Design a protein with these regions (language model features):
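Active-site residues of response regulator receiver
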Residues: 52, 80
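Receiver (REC) domain active-site loop signature in two-component systems and cognate sites
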Residues: 55
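Alpha4 helix (beta4-alpha4-beta5 surface) of REC/receiver domains from two-component response regulators
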Residues: 62, 83-105, 118
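Charged docking surfaces used in two-component/phosphorelay signaling
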Residues: 15-23
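Helix N-cap/capping motif at the beta->alpha junctions
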Residues: 30-39, 60
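Short amphipathic alpha-helix used as the core "switch/output" element in two-component signaling
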Residues: 39, 61-74, 93
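A Lys-centered signature of the CheY-like receiver
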Residues: 109
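Active-site beta3 strand of CheY-like receiver
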Residues: 44-50
Length: 138
């Protein structure tokens, strides 16, 4: 059963993701912010992390950078409702920034449950392939 860490300050988002993933045979740990996510990461081996970009206190970008530094082999999915730069706007492309900081994939809120599951399965498959390649090299 894959272990997923969900880090988001919105309890409704966390609950929806948790319920959906548990119904699909994932073990889910929810953290309500970056600090709580780091504490969870220290005590548990996760197969994947899902992290919101915009959170109070420890910002999502800071969380993504630190999570990636501490656990570089764990796939990290960044999510945000304020994610894409509009061609007519000078706003930054936050999801691209998350990828540059170490996120494996990005999801723009709102996303469908199927989109979430697809991204998770792709990340887990890629991580398993990398692990298998490393083991075969030894």
């Amino acid at each position: 059963m894959p272990r997923v860490l969900v880090v988001d300050d919105d309890p409704m988002v966390c609950m929806a993701i948790e319920i959906y993933l548990e119904r699909h045979s994932f073990h889910v740990t929810v953290a309500d912010g970056g600090e709580a996510g780091l504490r969870a990461l220290e005590g548990t081996a996760f197969d994947l992390m899902i992290v919101d970009i915009f959170m109070p206190h420890m910002r999502g970008f800071e969380s993504i950078r630190i999570f990636h530094e501490r656990a570089p082999t764990i796939p990290l999915v960044a999510m945000s409702g304020y994610a894409f730069a509009n061609l007519d706007s000078p706003a930054p492309d936050f999801l691209r920034m998350a990828l540059e900081l170490g996120a494996t994939r990005c999801l723009r809120k709102p996303f469908t449950p199927l989109a979430l599951l697809t991204v998770i399965n792709e990340c887990l498959t890629e991580a398993q392939s990398r692990f298998t390649s490393v083991v075969q090299l030894r």
